[in-house]
Amino acid sequence: MQQTSEWSCGVTAALMVLDWYGKLGDWNEESLAALRHSLDGTELEGYPGTTLNQAIDIFNGVGGFDIVSTKDYPDGIWLDDIQGWLAEGKPVMICWNDWGGHWQTIIGYDTMGTEETNDDVFLVADSYDTTDHNQDGYGIYPAERLMYNFSMYGAFPESEGGSDMLFLVASPAEG
């Protein structure tokens, strides 16, 4: 899925997750964006993008999802955490400083057939895939490099979920 505006990577990442689970229905960027709480009256007033708390709002608004996020991992996550969720068939939404702030969805992990992690890569669904000759919506990132730069460098306040290691794993609620 390609985002239709400069600010909509967060809601488009959520759309990708809904689509992955067959829960897309009639949801679109605009309807998901409307589920986010307003940032009016905060230091982010006028910011059109999506904070972690707003991403959580989206899945709570859609309903029927269990959510694991940065808030559940105060000491951060690492490669084995992401690999575990992927092994369970759960895509991992991440927000980091790519493009000055960008949500993407990790959908795969490749060890490159080695024991070391320094050559491992993430496969991401990227709604702003404009940097290669094949706008297919996918990207490949060195896994350790992304993890060591997995920050918004103070762009979001703690009251909105913070700025470091922002991730969200939404999966259909059990039971």
PLM feature segments, named:
Residues 1-73, 156, 162-165, 170-175:
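Cysteine-nucleophile protease catalytic domains, especially the papain-like/related folds used
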Residues 11, 15-18, 24-26, 36, ...:
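Generic ordered-secondary-structure signal
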Residues 13-14, 20-22, 30-31, 95, ...:
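Generic detector of ordered, mature protein regions
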Residues 23-24, 43-50, 76, 114, ...:
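Short, exposed beta-strand "edge-strand" segments with a Pro/Gly-rich flavor and a Y/T-containing core
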Residues 55-66, 99-106, 127-137:
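Short, surface-exposed, charge-dense and proline/glycine-enriched linear segments
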Residues 71-127:
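Active-site-adjacent substructure of cysteine-protease-like catalytic cores
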Residues 109-175:
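Noncatalytic regulatory segments and standalone regulatory/sensor domains
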